[in-house]
Amino acid sequence: MEIKGKRILVTGASRGLGRALVTALVDAGADQVIAGTRKPEDREPLKSEHVTPVQLDVTSDADVEAVARMGAIDILINNAGVAGFGNPLTMSFEALKEEIDVNYLGVVRVTRAVAPGMISKDDGMIVNVATAFAKVNLPIVGTYCATKAALLSLGQALRAYLSKHNVRVITVMPTTIDTDMSRGFDVPKMTKEFVASEILTAIREERHDPPIGDEANGLCEQLAKDPLAVEKTLMNYKA
């Protein structure tokens, strides 16, 4: 799908990959990027001719409904996410619930609000930002991976209902990105700018649930050959 001239909503746009996506979309010629942030102090630095920062906590029905009233969106990028590090047997239920509410239910909430506008004009794209570890769990962030596995499955369901309306749904799957979320996580990391650029390519080429980066591609190739071996290797990465 062409990006130039489009009206695009990015959730979780205040920093990290979200901020990089906003910059990349403007550079690619987007007409308006609606940049969703939770904190008021994060909005002012985002303001520009083609960027409209808005209050958007994806766990808030009121925030989501307010953004939906701003009018139809051409491309929705569900980027907002939180990650809890730890053992699912001992992590607090509050942390688990936050991951589910932001990473999964937040996507459902925003997509439900935005999809009717796409359906009405018989055109649009929904991009869900997951991880290649949605396909095989990385235990140190095991519950985060579980929410992203749910997101990958959700994308398949959304395609079933939206394809007849010419609304494309893709789930992009990077591995670890060098952002605040991965600070202290001693593994190879991709830059947020690289991942943003790859996501824009996936949008333009309408790729089907693409892995992002060499590590993600390699992981998916290994999974196709010997999924049990991959799982056993990743079992060593625990909190």
What do the PLM-derived regions correspond to, one by one?
Residues S14-R15:
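Conserved glycine-rich cofactor-binding loop
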Residues L89, L138-G142:
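Active-site loop immediately N-terminal to the catalytic Tyr-X3-Lys motif
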Residues A80-F85:
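Conserved NAD(P)H cofactor-binding loop of Rossmann-fold oxidoreductase domains
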Residues T171, T179, R183-E221:
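C-terminal helical subdomain
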Residues T131:
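Residue(s) in the substrate-gating loop at a strand-loop-helix junction
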Residues N87-K97:
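Substrate-binding pocket helix/loop in short-chain dehydrogenase/reductase
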Residues T111-R112, Q156:
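A short, exposed helix-loop element centered on a Lys and neighboring polar residues
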